[in-house]
Amino acid sequence: MMSKLGVLLTICLLLFPLFALPQDGDQPADRPAERMQDDISSEQNSLLEKRVTDRCCKGKRECGRWCRDHSRCCGRR
């Protein structure tokens, strides 16, 4: 009786992690089309673009440090 219980426990412990872990096809890195749809970029979001522009621009020729570091100043890409 104890050996049967041990075998059953061993089988359960070996099989459970295989089903509990996500499979390779379920990883976001394997689904680039879905990642691109979920990507929220400033090109798609005008409110974010406005916030970045307001944060960067101090004048026509002057850019803030954050804006220079991120290659965005006064609407330039």
Swiss-Prot record:
Q: Which InterPro entries match?
A: Conotoxin
Tell me the superkingdom of the source: Eukaryota
Report the SS bond pairs.
56-67, 57-73, 63-74
Specify the propeptide location in this chain.
23-51
One Pfam annotation reads Conotoxin
- Where does the signal peptide begin and end? 1-22
User: Where are the annotated segments for Disordered?
Assistant: 26-46
**UniProt-annotated location(s):** Secreted
Residue stretches of biased makeup (Basic and acidic residues):
28-38
Q: Name one GO cellular component term.
A: extracellular region
Q: Which GO terms describe its molecular function?
A: ion channel inhibitor activity; sodium channel regulator activity; toxin activity
| This protein's UniProt keywords | Amidation, Cleavage on pair of basic residues, Disulfide bond, Ion channel impairing toxin, Neurotoxin, Secreted, Signal, Toxin, Voltage-gated sodium channel impairing toxin
Tissue-level expression reads: Expressed by the venom duct.
List residues modified as Cysteine amide: 74
The role this protein plays is: Mu-conotoxins block voltage-gated sodium channels (Nav). This synthetic toxin potently blocks rNav1.2/SCN2A, and rNav1.4/SCN4A. It also moderately blocks rNav1.1/SCN1A, rNav1.3/SCN3A, rNav1.5/SCN5A, and mNav1.6/SCN8A. The inhibition is reversible.
Protein family per UniProt: Belongs to the conotoxin M superfamily.
Additional comments on file? Negative results: does not block rNav1.7/SCN9A, and rNav1.8/SCN10A.
The entry's free-text remark on domains says: The cysteine framework is III (CC-C-C-CC).
Name of the featured protein: Mu-conotoxin BuIIIA
